[in-house]
Amino acid sequence: HHGGEEMVFVLEGQLTFYLEGHKPYKLETYDTLYYPNYIGHRWSNDSDEPVRMLMVSTSPYNF
């Protein structure tokens, strides 16, 4: 990842989102998280229920 941005939108369920240097974010249905994508990140589903999410990523480069 080089200078772009990302957004996560939870369509259904709950997930925990981890951004390097930040406390974990507990996201639920309809929650949104926006961050620069050069920050280390990962997510997990800590429940037995399925999670559906939409992730959008931008690039600083023109294509």
PLM region spans:
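Short, conserved beta-strand element in jelly-roll/cupin
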Residues: 2-17
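Short acidic-glycine-tyrosine-enriched beta hairpin
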Residues: 21-36
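Ligand-binding loop in jelly-roll beta-barrel domains
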Residues: 28, 37-63
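Short beta-strand segments in beta-sandwich/barrel cores
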Residues: 13-18, 32-33, 41, 61
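Short histidine-centered beta-strand/loop micro-motifs
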Residues: 1-2, 19, 44-46
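Conserved beta-strand segments that form the floor/walls of ligand-binding pockets within enzyme
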Residues: 9, 34, 55
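Short secondary-structure boundary/capping segments
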Residues: 7, 24-25, 45
